[in-house]
Amino acid sequence: MINIGRLHHVSICINDLEATRHFYMDVLGMDDAQRPNSFNFPGQWFNKNGYEIHTIFKEAAGQVSGDAENIIKPGRDITFARHLCFSVDSVEGTVQTLKEHGVELIEGPRDRGDGATQMYIYDPDGHMVELVYEPWDWE
């Protein structure tokens, strides 16, 4: 058996570094993380509380960025869609920050059924992001 630790990072393909930087740093409050100097392809890393998002330009990765076109299947709940999820410390504060930055809620805030509140948004490249408030994490 492998003894794994926490999830280290998620890597996503992007189109526009400035829009991505604004979303992950200014809206979600992540910090710039140092990329290895040996990386000879464009992208940026973001860090918050020891977790990282690694971004790579779609041309360098040879992949399409985002997946919003196929993400919410008719007749299925949004929770079945591929997404990243970050915990947040306030529903009201999160909604206010999203409004201030012109980020549209695609669903929520809504009760998850166990006392938590879910909100769903898209990043600039169409990656779905869930923001979840679990009050027991912040008490």
Tell where the protein language model's regions lie, with residue ranges.
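Residues that flank catalytic or metal-binding motifs in active/ligand-binding sites
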Residues: 6, 42, 49-51, 80-82, ...
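Short, P/G- and charge-enriched loop/turn segments at secondary-structure junctions
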Residues: 69-74
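Short acidic/His/Gly/Ser-rich catalytic and metal-binding motifs that mark active-site loops
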Residues: 63-66
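A short acidic/small-residue loop/turn micro-motif
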Residues: 61, 113, 135-138
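N-terminal beta-strand motif that seeds the catalytic metal site of vicinal oxygen chelate
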Residues: 1-19, 39, 82-84, 135-139
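Vicinal oxygen chelate
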Residues: 14-18, 78-124, 128
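Short glycine-/small-residue motifs
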Residues: 131
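Core segments of cupin and vicinal oxygen chelate
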Residues: 13-58
